[in-house]
Amino acid sequence: MASVTGDEAVGIGLAVSHLASLGHRHIAYVGGDAEASTGLGRYQAFVARLQHQGLPLDPDLVAHADRFHEEPGAAAFAELLDRGTPFTAVVAANDRLALGCYDVLHERGLRVPEDVSVTGYNDMLFADRFDPALTTVRIPHYQVGVRAAQLLLEALADGESPPMTVRLAPSLVVRASTAPPRPA
């Protein structure tokens, strides 16, 4: 059976590269369930992009929530902050996890992006309503649907559906949640 999805590696790569281009060198990661394919894929993409950018991967700057939701994201991010390892930006594996990061930063008197830049993933309908509006990776949902329908129609016409995965390139929507880090 064929599947169509956004390219996780490209999407996370866009977020990390954007932060690196702003001057961030210590970037944290908050992921969802690392056992899920999405969680594992996005984390592996994060590690690979850090290496590609020549940036350090510090295990103290990685936290995984048990679900891709705001509350578990907040708990994972709070634990990460409590470790005391300095960082200037965080890549959240989806927008709901990013919202959890916002909650914790606000509770601790830290500001986005003045103290910590934040990126999300998915460009959910409310991402532009975050305060400040969230920089996030946009999955080409419409194009995913069109390509999936094309593959389905081809399979119905041919009577076959060869196993394949089609990955479509996402884009980065830059909003107000990212900025250069403050000078040390």
Predicted stretch roles:
Residues 1-21, 82, 86:
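Alpha-helical recognition/docking segments in bacterial nutrient-uptake
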Residues 3-14, 30-76, 91-99, 121-124, ...:
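Hinge/beta->alpha junction and helix N-cap segments in small-molecule ligand-binding domains
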Residues 13-16, 24-25, 49, 104, ...:
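Solvent-exposed, well-ordered amphipathic alpha-helical segments
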Residues 18, 78, 83-184:
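Flexible loop/turn connectors
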Residues 24-27, 86-88:
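Short acidic/polar active-site loop segments enriched in Thr and Asp
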Residues 25-27, 57-62, 112-117:
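Short acidic capping loops at alpha-helix termini that bridge into adjacent secondary structure
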